[in-house]
Design a protein with these regions (language model features):
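Structural motif
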Residues: 10-14, 71-76, 141-145, 169-170
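C-terminal structured domain segments
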Residues: 129-166
Length: 185
């Protein structure tokens, strides 16, 4: 058929582009995602289940039922006040709890850590579609490592999930700015 039966993804790049890249991958092919581990200087996952847990919470009730934003505080903490998100948006956050540590650059150590994020993310995206009928876009504010970015695009269901409006933090441009819109066809 000319299609590979398996793909391994070793991604490095700007987070918005990695989300877009993930959305272009076929979810009909078995795909593994890998993290470049800085301390150990390897792409190999550590053994075991890992300790990263993900807390999902609603941090702002918006005035418009179809305006939704999602903050991903994984590699670092994103504070609502730093985003410029308007009051009409309902805002949700997924935050990592890495044992006793707050969000940090080295939380993603095992494949299980990534799998738990993917479940939390998929559950929340589905919930947003149910709780905010008519939502066509989720405004996404990510502080996330590369494999998480790729899976954020990869795990969108074509013709089911809303588009992702991706924001990128850039201090030279005054904080978070819209970068691109990701659709999954």
């Amino acid at each position: 058929s000319g299609r590979p039966s398996h793909v391994s993804v070793y991604a490095i790049g700007p987070i918005p582009l990695l989300i877009q890249f993930g959305s272009s991958l076929s979810n009909k092919i078995t795909t593994d995602f890998y993290q470049k581990h800085r301390v150990r200087n390897t792409w190999k996952w550590s053994d075991g289940e890992g300790v990263a847990l993900y807390e999902t919470k609603k941090i702002q009730d918006g005035t418009a039922p179809n305006k939704v934003a999602l903050i991903l505080s994984l590699s670092g903490k994103i504070h609502l006040g730093s985003t410029g998100i308007a009051p009409e948006f309902s805002v949700y956050e997924i935050e990592v709890k890495d044992g006793e540590l707050a969000p940090n650059f080295s939380f993603l150590k095992t494949r299980a850590d990534l799998d738990r994020f993917r479940k939390a993310y998929a559950d929340l995206v589905s919930r947003l579609g149910r709780d905010h009928a008519g939502v066509t876009e989720i405004h996404l504010y990510p502080a996330i490592p590369a494999p998480v970015a790729v899976t954020c695009g990869f795990d969108l269901l074509p013709k089911v999930h809303p588009n992702l409006v991706i924001y990128d933090a850039d201090k030279t441009k005054g904080g978070f700015n819209q970068s691109l819109i990701v659709t999954r066809h």
